[in-house]
């Protein structure tokens, strides 16, 4: 049963660095069990003030979860408000956390930045 729970919510992350971008996302891959907290970090390109977190689900659909300008939230989905936590402090990596993982969280999570 423990193995089944462990494989319940596999979270894949794409390190943008592999595309020669200046955005760094860690960790590169996560596997979490149901109910576990999950945290991902994103270091935007130097000088960029906008940060975006996206989720690409198993149907290959992209959805913006949250966006920041500097430390302020610009857009936030209802799903993010209910199940996620994010922050983007000055001079530190931005983070995206899933408060309690569920099987439906199996997805590719992407961070992007712009000026």
UniProtKB/Swiss-Prot annotation:
One of its GO terms (cellular component) is plasma membrane. Residues 22-115 form the Ig-like domain. Disulfide bonds join 42-111. Residues 1-21 form the signal peptide. SUPFAM superfamilies: Immunoglobulin. The keyword Transferase does not apply. Keywords: Adaptive immunity, Cell membrane, Disulfide bond, Immunity, Immunoglobulin domain, Membrane, Receptor, Signal, T cell receptor. The keyword Disulfide bond applies. GO terms for biological process: adaptive immune response; cell surface receptor signaling pathway. PROSITE patterns: IG_LIKE. Alpha-beta TR is a heterodimer composed of an alpha and beta chain; disulfide-linked. The alpha-beta TR is associated with the transmembrane signaling CD3 coreceptor proteins to form the TR-CD3 (TcR or TCR). The assembly of alpha-beta TR heterodimers with CD3 occurs in the endoplasmic reticulum where a single alpha-beta TR heterodimer associates with one CD3D-CD3E heterodimer, one CD3G-CD3E heterodimer and one CD247 homodimer forming a stable octameric structure. CD3D-CD3E and CD3G-CD3E heterodimers preferentially associate with TR alpha and TR beta chains, respectively. Probable non-functional open reading frame (ORF) of V region of the variable domain of T cell receptor (TR) beta chain. Non-functional ORF generally cannot participate in the synthesis of a productive T cell receptor (TR) chain due to altered V-(D)-J or switch recombination and/or splicing site (at mRNA level) and/or conserved amino acid change (protein level). Alpha-beta T cell receptors are antigen specific receptors which are essential to the immune response and are present on the cell surface of T lymphocytes. This is Probable non-functional T cell receptor beta variable 23-1. The lineage of its organism: Eukaryota, Metazoa, Chordata, Craniata, Vertebrata. The gene is TRBV23-1.
């Amino acid at each position: 049963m423990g193995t089944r729970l462990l494989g319940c919510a596999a979270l894949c992350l794409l390190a943008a660095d592999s595309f020669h971008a200046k955005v760094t996302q860690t960790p590169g891959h996560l596997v979490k069990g149901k109910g576990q907290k999950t945290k991902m970090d994103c270091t935007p390109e130097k000088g960029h003030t906008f940060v975006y977190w996206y989720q690409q689900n198993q149907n290959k659909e992209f959805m913006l979860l949250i966006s920041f300008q500097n430390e302020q939230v610009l857009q936030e989905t209802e799903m993010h408000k209910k199940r996620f936590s994010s922050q983007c402090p000055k001079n530190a990596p931005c983070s995206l956390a899933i408060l309690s993982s569920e099987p439906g969280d199996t997805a590719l999570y992407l961070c992007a930045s712009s000026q």
